[in-house]
Amino acid sequence: MAFVKSGWLLRQSTILRRWKKNWFDLWSDGRLIFYDDQNRHDIEDKIHMRIHCINLRVGNECRDFQPPEGKQRDCLLQIVCRDGKTVNLCAESADDCLAWKIALQDARTNTGYVGSDVMYDETAISSAPPPYTAYATPSPEVYGYGYGQYHGAYPTVGPQVFYASNGQAYDVPYQYPYHGPYGQPPANHVIIRERYRDNDGDLALGMLAGAATGMALGSLFWVF
């Protein structure tokens, strides 16, 4: 915790309306504490600017009180609290009053204010930092690569249909290729040309035999 501003101010008592000199400390958390003297032994009163203060008046804005003898009205400062209480103050000069107004206004509106002249509280320095929260280290994910790691199914493909010249259809089962651990090898296509014959049945059987032989040889090349 740190002091934002400290100094002497005249404060008017609530009952006898007499002016008394008090030492004021404005903390960075918004607390305004005033003591009997600068030794800070006896606390006269305290106000939390962000919680209790609803208005801050300066100079001619101040109401229901007059400055002490020998002081100008532009030295006056009035703090209005939520419960209706007012704290009537008088600074040493108009410039000092303006400096207090700026510091108090910032303490009332800002969540964390630290002034230029900062003095640190010994209790804040000696306090321990917040406890460290340990987080568990996430376990690394293991991914397997290599042979036999793919468990997906090949897409279903129906049998291949070949038609002879007479219109008769022949079904040949589709053979799934084996890719192995090094990917799919280049396909080998085998084309067998038969001599033209007048017999349509012999031509169809030749085409069917050539297709079956090509697929068998292609599967053999894929394996190697």
Swiss-Prot record:
Binding residues for a 1,2-diacyl-sn-glycero-3-phospho-L-serine: K20
Pfam families for the chain: PH
Organism: Gallus gallus
One Gene Ontology term from the biological process aspect of the record: regulation of cell differentiation
Protein name: Pleckstrin homology domain-containing family B member 2
Domain remarks: The PH domain specifically binds phosphatidylserine, which is enriched in recycling endosome membranes, it doesn't recognize PIPs.
Occurrences of domain PH (ranges): 2-109
InterPro entries hit by this protein: PH-like_dom_sf, PH_domain, PLEKHB1/2
PROSITE patterns the UniProt entry points to: PH_DOMAIN
Function (record text): Involved in retrograde transport of recycling endosomes.
Keywords carried by this UniProt record: Endosome, Membrane
